[in-house]
Amino acid sequence: MGAFDYISSFCSYTYANAKTKRKPLQTVDIKVKMDCDGCERRVRNVVRRMKGVKSVEVNRKQSRITVNGHVDPNKVLKRVKSTGKKAEFWPYIPQHMVYYPFAPGMYDKRAPAGHIRNPTQSFPTANAPEENYVSLFSDDNVHAACSIM
């Protein structure tokens, strides 16, 4: 039977080939303003009924929902917004995760304790005026200083 099974594996259509790929297991954090138990229950039930959701944690004190499962973050956000609540992705990260947390614009009065705003890495544009002044007197370009004099 071993040879017959080996040959039939090439000819048959197996379930493994038809199996669809699932999204990877991920955690989605969403900030939602919830005032009462009814709001919390409504948001929890809407998210819990989504396909692929493993667990839902609601923290009303922080106005935060944490969803674990095989889900698309944008679909979770859209589903939470369908309840009529204003929702956005969680904009805060723990303070110890940032290399330099003392940069301006990082602290927010509404952020929970030990969290700061998620920093955005902004680099200066190539033709910024400060860039031109800094490179004017650099040691790499010796002839630039002579052109001014």
Swiss-Prot record:
Propeptide stretch(es), residue numbers: 147-149
Disulfide bond entries: none
Assembly notes: Interacts with ZHD11/HB29.
SUPFAM superfamilies: HMA, heavy metal-associated domain
Gene Ontology CC annotations of this record: membrane
Name recorded for this polypeptide: Heavy metal-associated isoprenylated plant protein 21
PROSITE patterns: HMA_2
UniProt keyword annotation of Metal-binding present: yes
Presence of keyword Transferase: no
UniProt gene name: HIPP21
